[in-house]
Curated annotation (Swiss-Prot):
Quaternary organization: In plastids the minimal PEP RNA polymerase catalytic core is composed of four subunits: alpha, beta, beta', and beta''. When a (nuclear-encoded) sigma factor is associated with the core the holoenzyme is formed, which can initiate transcription.
Origin species: Nandina domestica
UniProt keywords, alphabetically: Chloroplast, DNA-directed RNA polymerase, Metal-binding, Nucleotidyltransferase, Plastid, Transcription, Transferase, Zinc
Identification of the protein by name: DNA-directed RNA polymerase subunit beta''
Main subcellular location: plastid
EC class of the enzyme, as a word: transferase
Length: 1377
């Protein structure tokens, strides 16, 4: 009775953990048998009560949490703001995903915490509440899904779906939510199946590695130990106790001079408590790592057996127990795949909140600006940062630990409880970080730009993978490549350095021409050496460089002759855009044709002048002949408007549908040559005409002599001698349409095609008719060039239109002579500029065109820019004037004076600007060539900006635009084509003519004025400004304008440069509209034209795919982010972690890649200590280090799951995978071959015996490799790759000593554990006899073996029962592999 009185009376609800504690205390107090009796009674009691209560669960018992509505609403609001930031390019996709997941996770967690108090207050006897919180059925997570919200689900890959399920199961799910939750549920079911098999396989491999480890000895005599220190802050007290209990001390422990524990004493709970209270020095304990042998273990190094609390028995198969202890929780835990919370939290960081309102102050030198995980700006502090918050009457000091983010700025006013800093979740948190790649794909097609320098990743110097050094935007500029059914082209400017990326219209990718196995060569033929050698200068000054670039034909890879090279001769302002034909059906080589865009040197087009032309290869002949237009001559009467002007020669456009070409073969021979055929004779094909030439066609020969030359024509065709009745017109020839037969002729046959009938009179009386075949050409629309140049993006009035015009290059009936082997173009398709003439067109209008170069980061883009302008000054063109001088004013020499012949009104009227813009983009990139077309959807116009006031002295406020007027008529300043000494003119409006010079005083400024400036510009980009009182500085390299603001400007103007990028919602001027995101391509006086672009944010370390300026299609990979994410905590993710650690896969998640660390330790230590010691100590230290970190990693996984596994089990396994070294190179000793895996101890012994260094380094084997590198080939063969293992063993003549369990099981022998263990000791005496016989037969080898194991015997001489081991080791010294 006395005992019972000591027990305390407990009056409280007992849950699972309390039950565990109760049972363990009962066992301590009463022992096993009595405890089980008590527990039986408890069980009976429980069942009785449950039967009486009979809890049932109905749908009404599921009470939803009232605060859910506003919590969800709040989270949605945050997500919306986030979405906006992502759209503006402030955060990138990974940050957005991470933050939105964290928002929802926090919401879900908050609801979950609300759940319990809510039940407790509203309905404490609720069945759901009773069941789940007593631990009977259902856990918090499941109840949370019933009454809170289901929250985030993961997809089959284990990635989070960032669309949370907001409803709970009580309210019911929407359709989308249902589908997403099916994802998660299906994953749960599949995982359970898959993971069970995974866990089983893991167990099998673990057992395989350690099956031969048995306790064979009481003490191995080791002097080493692992030190464990309670002071070290990294281990908690609980883990410290777990580590120590059941171990054996390796050293005496003193407190002061008093010894409280001696070596080889096993540690019980009492001793541990004393250690904790005394906080003694680090405690050195024996672990399986310190044991001397690799193939067995001794009792003291193993410690207590966890089953009965005493030292482990001899003959215990501890290896198998260890393997099963680690593998088994895996199989158990796979059943827990219900997705419980711990998903994707980035270790939700702790926050530091402000204690009171006030101003915050800290030292700014100690912090660095950075981005948080969510892309918010913050400051990072590297050391402890002291922050003071000054309120009205109180100062608070807050210390912020290192590596934290400060979320406020210096001197900022903070409110109480505002978050001022975020402490990084320390490394001690038990969630696993792993590196994940996330690809971001482009949403639209377009051209890629980036705004900072980008490094090539070192492995891919020539590839298209780049690394970003700092945070920057990637821009996808809209506008796609021109896709045509038959053509693809590339554009080369003079002297461009090109790469082999060419855009092919058929393939969607940038096709490498090397695909068709033709090596594409680039030849640069230049008429003069360009600059110094080695400088890659793009030189545009030479007027006639020839560049020939080798686009081989896709059809015949082997042919590389002249036609397959495109010779693009570039005059000063002419581009040729070559088309590329890829016609599979006609197996012939079609030479390239190209669109030529030509701009006159002064950049002025009149109406109806030709902007570009294209030679259609369908209207191309390589033989001579005659063109005829239709039979009716009236068609060739041309109306006045159809006059188009080309290179100052008018051409007539003939409105005909078809024309005819009559081929003939023409040879023009020198007068002296002897002709071998007669006039009017008929010859066949390939007849010799002169010594060198032969005829290509057969037919009638006509020979004429002209001016010292003989012209010889061969007409092919049929000859008819007409009867009396046939009247043939006396014309030179007529065309007869198909279907008309010869009248009254005997053979009235119909002609299928058009024919040309020509009358030939060889003599006066006789004549006959030659019927010649005719090639008919229908003039189709040709290639629709208008699609190349989309109409004006901004749909303005007064626009320049483009007409497509076909005209025939040769007149009616004119003979065409082809020089030998050249092609004759019959029809040319032209683009003609046209615009609506004003009715009262007093002055002539003209178009000013220029190639605009927009330069961003050394990538030059060419636009063609056209502006329709009334010519301000009527001009006369002098015949011999140089090209640039066409626009000189009547008295152009005096440039301070405006032209006096025009009144004020007249000038203002003539300078109203008609903006006609046809814009196309010529890409002049080094790497990929294409035309990019901007259509109206890709551009938008901003402007005009109103509201900048100039205050004059007369206090008149005159509204002007915030962009000062620049050059109203000739397009934007600074984009003059870079032509040598091209003088460009900038007109600025003057309201009253006032003479201005630099001595003017301010009181004269009664009117607003701007003045006319001349700039002279040479091709280097320098600007010579003859006018000293200019108020504009031009920086020629960036083409920026800096406006010097005068005193009368109230606000400064924004600097807008050509090629600048804007993000959305950036304000340019105070009153101006908000921008969309894009790149400025045209700056007008009062407005901008912006090419729309989408920004993608990329942070350092991201990989950019693709080249700068490359065309990307929708869905192409743009960037790859590598980011750390925390795996969700359930064991489904945990098990693969254990497996990765045990297999030592070099996955980034193994902290900083253990293998690399191992190599690092190996090298450094060897370097410090020199060769022989270096290898030994290097390997030892390396192995010790890696062992500790591996054990900690594996424990971390299991602890996070709440599974307790004793360290020694893990240590036994880790010992097996870290105890081998790799022989690195062959020294003098030929004992081991390089690349051989040997045990560390064996390497040391051999090194000592041979007194010579063996070079080796520590390696980490995975468990699979370790299983295949054991002492026993039978065990290896029964594991994996049976045939290979057995074959190798046979070739090497390996001997299996049957020491392990598995080999004996396979062969049916007695296994050497437990009672069978003693048998092994008796058997060993026979081994020693065999050993002696062998020594006699091979004295040298035996002697060497003696040396080898001599030191071993010294060690063991003091230990009883050492006879068995040493003899056996002697025998197996060299043979075991």
């Amino acid at each position: 009775m006395a005992e019972r009185a000591d027990l305390v009376f407990h009056n409280k609800a007992i849950d699972g953990t309390a039950m565990k504690r109760l049972i363990s205390r009962l066992i301590d107090h009463f022992g096993m048998a009595y405890t089980s009796h008590i527990l039986d009674q408890i069980k009976t009691l429980g069942f009785q009560q449950a039967t009486a209560t009979s809890i049932s669960l109905g749908i009404d018992d599921l009470l939803t949490i009232p605060s859910k509505g506003w919590l969800v609403q709040d989270a949605e609001q945050q997500s919306l703001i986030l979405e906006k930031h992502h759209h503006y390019g402030n955060v990138h996709a990974v940050e957005k995903l991470r933050q939105s997941i964290e928002i929802w996770y926090a919401t879900s967690e908050y609801l979950r915490q609300e759940m319990n108090p809510n039940f407790r207050m509203t309905d404490p006897s609720n069945p759901v509440h009773i069941m789940s919180f007593s631990g009977a059925r259902g856990n918090a997570s499941q109840v949370h899904q019933l009454v809170g919200m289901r929250g985030l689900m993961s997809d089959p890959q284990g990635q989070m779906i960032d669309l949370p399920i907001q409803s709970n199961l009580r309210e019911g799910l929407s359709l989308t939510e249902y589908i997403i939750s099916c994802y998660g549920a299906r994953k749960g079911v599949v995982d359970t199946a898959v993971r069970t098999s995974d866990a089983g396989y893991l167990t099998r491999r673990l057992v395989e590695v350690v099956q031969h480890i048995v306790v064979r000895r009481t003490d191995c005599g080791t002097l080493r130990g692992s030190s464990v220190s309670p002071r070290n802050g990294t281990i908690t007290e609980r883990i410290f106790i777990q580590t120590l209990i059941g171990r054996v001390l390796a050293d005496d422990i003193y407190i002061g001079s008093r010894c409280i524990a001696i070596r080889n004493q096993d540690i019980g709970i009492g001793l541990v408590n004393r250690f904790i209270t005394f906080r003694a020095q680090p405690i050195s304990i024996r672990t399986p790592f310190t044991c001397k042998s690799t193939s067995w273990i001794c009792r003291l190094c193993y410690g207590r057996s966890p089953t009965h609390g005493d030292l482990v028995e001899l003959g215990e198969a501890v290896g198998i127990i260890a393997g099963q202890s680690i593998g088994e929780p895996g199989t158990q835990l796979t059943l827990r795949t219900f997705h419980t919370g711990g998903v994707f939290t980035g270790g939700t960081a702790e926050h530091v909140r402000a204690p009171s309102n006030g101003k915050i102050k800290f030292k700014e030198d100690l912090v660095h600006p950075t981005r948080t995980r969510h892309g918010h700006p913050a400051f990072l502090c590297y050391i402890d940062l002291y922050v003071t918050i000054e309120g009205q009457d109180i100062r608070h000091n807050v210390t912020i630990p290192p590596k934290s983010f400060l979320l406020v700025q210096n001197d900022q006013y903070v409110e109480s409880e505002q978050v001022i800093a975020e402490i990084r979740a320390g490394t001690s948190t038990l969630n696993f970080k792993e590196r994940v790649r996330k690809h971001i794909y482009s949403d639209s097609e377009g051209e890629m730009h980036w705004s900072t320098a980008v490094y090539h990743a070192p492995e891919y110097t020539y590839g298209n993978v780049h690394l970003l050094p700092k945070t920057s935007h990637l821009w996808i500029l809209s506008g796609g490549p021109y896709r045509s059914s038959i053509v693809s082209f590339s554009l080369h400017k003079d002297q461009d350095q090109m790469n082999v990326h060419s855009l092919s219209a058929e393939q969607k990718s940038i096709s490498n021409l090397l695909v068709t196995n033709n090596q594409v060569r680039h030849k640069f033929l230049s008429s003069e050496p360009s600059g110094k050698k080695g400088e890659r200068i793009l030189d545009y000054s030479g007027p006639n460089r020839i560049i020939c670039n080798g686009h081989c034909n896709f059809i015949y890879p082997a042919i590389l002759h002249e036609n397959s090279y495109l010779l693009a001769k570039r005059r000063r302002n002419r581009f040729i855009i070559p088309f590329q034909y890829n016609q599979e059906q006609e197996k012939e080589l079609i030479t390239r044709s190209g669109i030529s865009i030509e701009i006159p040197i002064n950049g002025i087009f009149r109406r109806n002048s030709i902007l570009a032309y294209f030679d259609d290869p369908r209207y191309r002949r390589n033989s001579s002949g005659i063109t005829k237009y239709g039979t009716i001559e009236a068609h060739s009467i041309v109306k006045k408007e159809d006059l188009i002007e080309y290179r100052k020669r008018p051409k007539y456009q003939t409105k005909i549908d078809r024309f005819f070409f009559i081929p003939e073969e023409v040879h023009i021979l020198p007068g002296s040559s002897s002709v071998m055929v007669r006039n009017n004779s008929i010859i066949g094909v390939n007849t010799r005409i002169t010594f060198k030439t032969r005829s290509r066609v057969g037919g009638l020969v006509r020979v004429e002599k002209k001016k010292k030359k003989i012209e010889l024509k061969i007409f092919s065709g049929d000859i008819h001698f007409p009867g009396e009745t046939d009247k043939i017109s006396w014309h030179s020839g007529i065309l007869i349409p198909p279907g008309t037969g010869k009248k009254n002729s005997k053979e009235s046959k119909n002609f299928k095609n058009w024919i040309y009938v020509q009358r030939i009179t060889p003599t006066k009386k006789k004549y006959f008719v030659l019927v010649r075949p005719v090639v008919t050409y229908e003039i189709a629309d040709g290639i629709n060039l208008a699609t190349l140049f989309p109409q004006d993006p901004l749909q303005e009035r007064d626009n320049v239109q483009l007409r497509v015009v076909n005209y025939i290059l040769y007149g009616n009936g004119k003979p065409i002579r082809g020089i030998s082997h050249t092609n004759i173009q019959l029809v040319r398709t032209c683009l003609v500029l046209n615009w609506d003439q004003e009715k009262n067109g007093s002055s002539m209008e003209e178009v000013h065109a220029s190639f605009v170069e927009v330069r961003v980061n050394n990538l030059i883009r060419d636009f063609i820019r056209m502006d329709l302008v009334k010519s301000p000054i009527s001009y006369t063109r002098k015949r011999n004037a140089p090209a640039g001088s066409e626009l000189i004013l009547a008295n152009g020499s005096d440039y301070t004076n405006l032209n006096p012949f025009y009144s004020k009104a007249r000038i203002q009227q003539s300078l109203t600007q008609h903006q006609g813009t046809i814009r196309t983009l010529l890409n002049r990139n080094k790497e990929c060539q294409s035309l990019i077309f901007l259509s109206s959807s890709n551009c938008f116009r901003i402007g005009p900006f109103k509201g900048l006031k100039y205050n004059n002295m007369t206090k008149k406020s005159n509204k002007r635009d915030s962009l000062l007027l620049i050059r109203n008529s000739l397009g934007p300043l600074g984009i003059v084509p870079k032509i040598a000494n091209f003088s460009s003119f900038y007109y600025l409006i003057t309201h009253n003519q006032i003479l201005i010079n630099k001595y003017l005083l301010l009181d004269n400024l009664k009117q607003t004025f701007q003045k006319l400036k001349y700039y002279l510009m040479d091709e280097n980009g320098r600007i010579y400004n003859p006018d000293p009182c200019s108020n504009m500085i031009l920086n020629p390299f960036n083409w920026n304008w800096y406006f010097l603001h005068h005193d009368y400007c109230e606000e400064t103007s924004t600097i807008i440069s050509l090629g600048q990028f804007f993000c959305e919602n950036v304000c340019i001027s105070k009153y101006g509209p908000h921008l969309k995101s894009g790149q400025v391509i045209i700056v007008h006086v009062d407005s901008l034209v912006i090419r729309s672009a989408k920004p993608y944010l990329a942070t350092p370390g991201a990989t950019v795919h693709g080249h700068y300026g490359e065309i990307l299609y929708k869905g192409d990979t743009l960037v790859t982010f590598i980011y750390e994410k925390s795996r969700s905590g359930d064991i489904t993710q945990g098990l693969p972690k254990v497996e990765q650690v045990l297999e030592v896969r070099s996955i980034d998640s193994i902290s900083m890649n253990l293998e690399k660390r191992v190599e690092g330790w190996n090298e450094r230590i060897t370097r410090i200590l020199g060769i022989p010691w270096g290898f030994l100590i290097g390997a030892e230290l390396t192995i010790a280090q890696s062992r500790v970190s591996l054990v900690n990693k594996i424990q971390k996984v299991y602890r996070s799951q709440g599974v307790q596994i004793h360290n020694r089990h893990i240590e036994i396994i880790v010992r097996q995978i870290t105890s081998k070294v790799l022989v690195s190179e062959d020294g003098m000793s030929n004992v081991f071959s390089p690349g051989e895996l040997i045990g560390l101890l064996r390497a040391e012994r051999t090194g000592r015996a041979l007194e010579e260094a063996i070079c080796y380094r520590a390696v980490l084997l995975g468990i699979t490799r370790a299983s295949l590198n054991t002492q026993s080939f039978i065990s290896e063969a029964s594991f994996q790759e049976t045939a290979r293992v057995l074959a190798k063993a046979a070739l090497r003549g390996r001997i299996d000593w049957l020491k392990g369990l598995k080999e004996n099981v396979v062969l049916g022998g007695m296994i050497p554990v437990g009672t069978g263990f003693k048998g092994l000791v008796h058997r060993s005496s026979q081994h020693s006899n065999i050993s002696l016989e062998i020594q006699n037969t091979n004295l040298f080898e035996g002697g060497m073996r003696d040396i080898l194991f001599h030191h071993r015997e010294l060690f063991y001489s003091c230990i009883p029962k050492n006879f068995h081991d040493t003899s056996e080791q002697k025998f197996t010294g060299f043979i075991d592999s």
